[in-house]
């Protein structure tokens, strides 16, 4: 078997893998270091006749995803650290309603608004949940770009 090897950034790999997995809608809001996912999908989704919306805020993006997946459409958003913290109430509603929300958290370090370089500080928030209620969500934590593709 002759497989082509491609060198690509993790953000681009996740975006293309989402397309390959049949994602029909992407709702996002730009925040470093995940902005490349939205940039990539802004062109590709249009070419494929799929929906791309740059939301007015992170809260708008996660709520649009919840609306889309509640109708049976494969949809996703991506964000980073402090913006994911803003989404916690919506994520607890998604868990309560058992909605298949896909949220890519390209983490960055630091408390508050943090810094713009990658880190793993949000892992506990993702695993243990930051919203109200006693719930667990499925967390896939890739450690390589290949795993980003395989797990998307």
Question: Model segments located where?
Answer:
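Conserved thiamine diphosphate
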Residues: 118-152
């Amino acid at each position: 078997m002759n497989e082509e090897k491609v060198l690509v950034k993790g953000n681009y790999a996740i975006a293309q893998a989402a397309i390959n997995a049949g994602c029909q809608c992407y709702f996002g809001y730009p925040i470093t270091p995940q902005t490349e996912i939205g940039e990539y999908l802004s062109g590709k989704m249009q070419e494929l006749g799929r929906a791309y919306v740059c939301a007015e805020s992170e809260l708008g993006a996660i709520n649009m995803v919840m609306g889309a997946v509640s109708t049976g459409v494969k949809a996703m958003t991506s964000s980073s650290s402090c913006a994911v913290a803003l989404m916690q109430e919506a994520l607890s509603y998604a868990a309560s309603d058992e909605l298949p929300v896909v949220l890519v958290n390209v983490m960055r370090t630091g408390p508050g608004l943090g810094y713009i370089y990658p880190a793993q500080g949000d892992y506990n928030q993702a695993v243990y949940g930051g919203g109200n209620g006693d719930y667990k969500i499925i967390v896939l934590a890739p450690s390589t770009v290949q795993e980003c593709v395989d797990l998307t």
